[in-house]
Amino acid sequence: MNGNRFGRLFQVTTYGESHGEAMGVTVSGVPAGVELDEEAIQAQLDRRKPGQSMITTSRGEPDEVVVNSGVQDGYTTGTPIGMVIQNKDARSGKYEPYVTAPRPSHGDYTYSAKFGTRNWGGGGRSSARETVNWVAAGAVAEQVLDASEYDVEIKAHVNQIGDVEADDVSFEQILDHSEENDVRCADPEAAAEMQELIERYQEAGDSIGGSIYFECRGVPRGLGAPRFDGFPSRLGQAMFSIPATTGVEFGLGKDAVNVTGSERNEDWTFDDGESFDHVESEEGDPVPVGNDHGGLQGGITTGEPIYGEATWHAPTSIPKKQRSADWETGEEKDVQVVGRHDPVLPPRAVPVVEAMLYCTVLDFMLLAGRINPDRVDGNPGQYDTDYHPSSPDND
């Protein structure tokens, strides 16, 4: 099975199945000399882990990460970083009825049709359990960016569940308030309505979809390339790798269908040194007046905030009775998915979205030479045996 790696220079390779022994990720392309805080990695995993509230699955996974390579005395060595998260609360027995009778709208049949076999416990490789690897990788990417000269900030929050929409909020409000409720919505009134809606579907044995707003600040201009290597092209690929993603938008997104060219096109002016939020822009530089394009023009970053929205359909594992076709017996039959599952995805997907953004931004920064891919201090290829911060001579 291919398709388990993402990135060009900052490469993330994952493995593991939902009910296997462990989940794991190998991160290559991390420069040497980054002080890696393993507690910060764990903190991000804790934001994603199951069982954290009444509106998440009750599966009791501690999601404790073990970093087993690529780090010495707390600093990265430039070699691949390996991280492992053990699965400690898998219960595969409840999935035996679906071995030959695929659950509706899952990957059960398609995996079996393609490979002739599959790990059926908990959905195996197709499970959203796999996103724990991406969050670990994203936490590493965040720390590499923090160690650079660039002040990159990335944040997301749930802006819609079902028909309940949050009011538009500022980036600062998302930073300050998105973690204050179980839904991870920075609008407290909307969050309360969302929670009530989720619980109503949950009690009915059903599920509901939603969306997440994301924003990146401090990303310099000039990242990305035309066509297939454009910044939105690669970020879109990363977002669509998150299970159940049905749409990714940038800037005005789908609302652009109702906007004329003359309304959407943004005039250019000169930076006056006070009015614009553009990375690296100096007084007198040309800058676009607005940012309806979401910080992206021609597939390349403009230096303005990058923002957009990603959408998820309702979780497909629900206890409501549904119909399936058993390919072994040749009969149709009722199935009920009685395992432990989330009634909604966006609240736990927020750290996954942020992780995908961090991984993508760092990869582009390395590709553009904005960050030295060899080491956080010094020139690429510079030879210095005393460089590494853990060297005894640097005490």
From Swiss-Prot:
Co-factor(s): FMNH2
Keywords, alphabetical: Amino-acid biosynthesis, Aromatic amino acid biosynthesis, FAD, Flavoprotein, FMN, Lyase, NADP
Catalytic activity from the UniProt record: 5-O-(1-carboxyvinyl)-3-phosphoshikimate = chorismate + phosphate
GO CC entries: cytosol
Gene Ontology biological process terms, A to Z: amino acid biosynthetic process; aromatic amino acid family biosynthetic process; chorismate biosynthetic process
Cofactor note: Reduced FMN (FMNH(2)).
Record InterPro entries: Chorismate_synth, Chorismate_synth_AroC_sf, Chorismate_synthase_CS
Family named by the database record: Belongs to the chorismate synthase family.
PANTHER family: CHORISMATE SYNTHASE
Name of the molecule in the record: Chorismate synthase
Natural source organism: Halorubrum lacusprofundi (strain ATCC 49239 / DSM 5036 / JCM 8891 / ACAM 34)
Source species taxonomy: Archaea, Methanobacteriati, Methanobacteriota, Stenosarchaea group, Halobacteria
Protein encoded by which gene: aroC
